[in-house]
Amino acid sequence: MRVVIQRVNHAQVNINGKTVGKIGKGVMLLVGIKNGDELPVVKKAADKIAKMRIFEDEEGKTNLSLKDVGGEILSVSQFTLMANTKKGNRPSFVDAMRPPKSKELWEDFNKELEADSFHVETGEFGADMQVELENDGPFTIVLDL
């Protein structure tokens, strides 16, 4: 599993000109599920993101978690994160888990975050989406599990 975590002031995802998910201060998550991923990996990723101290305290140090700042989450499934670019010029996506299992695990991931009392907005699995966001920092982390 690979999750790109971007600290944002606000973010939204649109499909065909319609906003389907929108948040204020929090994190934008681009989520890639790979072959072999199972529920324990999803739970670990959600827990790690919930506790990761990526927000600044009053002294400007990154000591606060998403929960500490009351942040929101925008989660978007993105199989292209699992691209293999080692050979040739065309990325290979053979490592990306195929639906319906990948959709199920992405939904489980979002449910884990919601169960931890986060407000979670999402894109639509498999849809062509337009994402708008304002990075805060920028502060971006790639979580590989």
Swiss-Prot record:
Reaction(s) the record says it catalyses: glycyl-tRNA(Ala) + H2O = tRNA(Ala) + glycine + H(+); a D-aminoacyl-tRNA + H2O = a tRNA + a D-alpha-amino acid + H(+)
Motif (Gly-cisPro motif, important for rejection of L-amino acids): 137-138
EC code(s) of this entry: 3.1.1.96
Main location as per UniProt: cytoplasm
Subcellular location: Cytoplasm
InterPro entries: Daa-tRNA_deacyls_DTD, DTD-like_sf
A GO term for molecular function: D-tyrosyl-tRNA(Tyr) deacylase activity
Pfam families reported for this sequence: Tyr_Deacylase
Functional note: An aminoacyl-tRNA editing enzyme that deacylates mischarged D-aminoacyl-tRNAs. Also deacylates mischarged glycyl-tRNA(Ala), protecting cells against glycine mischarging by AlaRS. Acts via tRNA-based rather than protein-based catalysis; rejects L-amino acids rather than detecting D-amino acids in the active site. By recycling D-aminoacyl-tRNA to D-amino acids and free tRNA molecules, this enzyme counteracts the toxicity associated with the formation of D-aminoacyl-tRNA entities in vivo and helps enforce protein L-homochirality.
Annotated domain remarks: A Gly-cisPro motif from one monomer fits into the active site of the other monomer to allow specific chiral rejection of L-amino acids.
Subunit structure: Homodimer.
Family of the protein in this entry: Belongs to the DTD family.
Name of the protein: D-aminoacyl-tRNA deacylase
Species, as recorded: Lactobacillus helveticus (strain DPC 4571)
Gene (name only): dtd
